[in-house]
Amino acid sequence: MANPASYRPRTGEIPTNPGVYRFRDPHGRVIYVGKAKSLRSRLNSYFANPAGLLPKTYAMVHAASSVEWTVVGSELESLQLEYTWIKEFKPRFNVVFRDDKTYPYLAVTLGEKYPRVQVMRGDKRKGTRYFGPYTAGAIRETMDTLLRVFPVRSCSAGVFKRAESSGRPCLLGYIDKCSAPCVGRISPEDHRALAEDFCAFMGGEAKRFTNKLEKQMAAAVARLDYEQAARIRDDITALRKVFERNAVVLAEDTDADVFALHEDELEAAVQVFHVRGGRIRGQRGWVVEKVEDFTTPDLVEHLLQQVYGEDGETHGRLPREVLVPVAPSNAEELTEWLSGIRGARVDVRVPQRGDKAALMSTVRENAEHALKLHKTRRAGDLTVRSQALQELQEALDLPVPLLRIECFDVSHVQGTNVVASMVVVEDGLPKKSDYRKFSITGPAASDDTAAMHDVLTRRFRHYLQDKSAQVDEDVLEAGTAEAAAEAAADAAAEAAVADTTTPIPKTKFAYPPNLVVVDGGQPQVNAAARALADLGIDDVYVVGLAKRLEEVWLPDSDFPVILPRTSQGLYLLQRIRDEAHRFAISFHRQKRGKAMTVSALDGVPGLGASKRKALLAHFGSVKGVKAATPEELAQAKGIGPALAAAIVSHFTGGGPAAVTVPAINMTTGEIIET
């Protein structure tokens, strides 16, 4: 770990202006972004007494090797720049309000010809309207109930196309929970109107629809159509059941998000209730670790910045009111920023009395319970992870902590479709965004050791390339007196804002591991170590985990390291190895599936997939292609005289890749058509 004194800038070099600062690790990766009203005061607080810092801040300062800053003209600009950098660099030590992903959304795909109602998680899409978030059980119950009244399509594209081609709707079409636009029971216009009514009901206009249905029921009774009246009565009951599931907590015209938090010295739990039309429409929760000695107003500011920067900026779901437990830091600038995102005024308020204050108290109780539950669950998990990493470091006699581990596995079936996987673990937890897949061809696919050497060479060659090209885009280089003086002079002269939003090139492999784990024994370990040595890399340690006896092998060692069967370090290695194996197998199956069908046309030089399809569409089968003359072949789309001659030469034995085998489905052994 670096000594903070080795990169501490001189006090006189740091400007007293507002600005945003970044800490980088020895590999140039941004690990923390912060903002300050006075850069000098804030940065000095990191170095004056490192021993007095919070544990995570202490770890961040010692993991960094440099600090740099950018001077801005106002606190609003520093807020915007800090958010931009956190979103771009995803620093590992920043407070990140990660959704627990328990709550999906009810989505209506209004951008499609036939809108679809479905449950969705993850990134939001344009042309789709979202309601929620809700709990998984509640959303499916709501959807099932509403499809009685609004029978909107809910099937996937594949099911819809099959029904369209067969002329028969799916089961929902037969039980009247879908209007079956796939078979023409309803026009596209009427189906869209149905989907828009669904959205209007979910948006809070329930009373309009129940009143409308009550009039229809009365009309049905008047004409003695009691069966129709009974169906409408059941629809009204279903709508009221959904509508009453969310209790009215505020005035009906109230749209607000109510935030509350409960915190201790190290962590904070956040809960938010989404109130639309006076009713609680959804709930979300987060638990975050504190990096700095944040006050509650600081936490509220970061919370709103991240929640609405991600959701509101792209999807426009910012309500008119945001209720918070305490006024956030930089409240005026934050309100201005949120209003700019919404396109209309947003009020950030602290409720003092009445129904809103009572609801805030309920949300706070939820946050308190969430933090207790999180600590109960995490206590054992955090202890076990720390113990596993410590045991592994001691057993392998490594001088550095195992902050990042990468594991590689090779997968194939009798030397065909050779692939490899790379999985990443940081702080004992999988980091799936850094997982990578490799296809292996040529001589490297001849055996496992050659494949392992090839994969490690490719991965760390990328690392060396990314490392050399990573930090070229910074506008203001901190840590030098010249840069700081220039920034201070610019700010004093015209309060200019440095242009720091230039995108930095994305790097895939710029961050190296402390430990490489390979699936295999001594041969695979030696191949991996040789790949690193060939590239001149000597600060990454390599081990292998052999499956048979779960032995840990080191490079050029005649005997393995034996870890106790109850060792948490061994369990960690096994979990990483098994995850790499799973990831490699899934990629191998995917690749093998694409190659399941081989054809006699595959070996024709210059004949790609689209031209093969054109030939088969023109002649009907491979047999028809074989029987065609060059002139007939040239009539097919995309086939010129030279390619037509090559096809004829291929089938008559004149080509180098002539084949006589029929097309075969490699899974079933079925002869397709020749």
Swiss-Prot record:
Residues 207-242 form the UVR domain. NCBIfam families: PRK00558.1-5, uvrC. Pfam families: GIY-YIG, HHH_5, UVR, UvrC_RNaseH, UvrC_RNaseH_dom. InterPro entries: GIY-YIG_endonuc, GIY-YIG_endonuc_sf, GIY-YIG_UvrC_Cho, Hlx-hairpin-Hlx_DNA-bd_motif, RuvA_2-like, UVR_dom, UVR_dom_sf, UvrABC_protein_C. One of its GO terms (biological process) is nucleotide-excision repair. Belongs to the UvrC family. Its main location: cytoplasm. PANTHER family: UVRABC SYSTEM PROTEIN C, UVRC/OXIDOREDUCTASE. PROSITE patterns: GIY_YIG, UVR, UVRC. It comes from the Bacteria. It is found in: Cytoplasm. This is UvrABC system protein C. Transmembrane segments: none annotated. Keywords: Cytoplasm, DNA damage, DNA excision, DNA repair, Excision nuclease, SOS response. GO terms for cellular component: cytoplasm; excinuclease repair complex. The lineage of its organism: Bacteria, Bacillati, Actinomycetota, Actinomycetes, Micrococcales. CDD domains: GIY-YIG_UvrC_Cho (cd10434). Residues 16-95 form the GIY-YIG domain. The UvrABC repair system catalyzes the recognition and processing of DNA lesions. UvrC both incises the 5' and 3' sides of the lesion. The N-terminal half is responsible for the 3' incision and the C-terminal half is responsible for the 5' incision. Interacts with UvrB in an incision complex. Coiled coil: none annotated. One of its GO terms (molecular function) is excinuclease ABC activity.
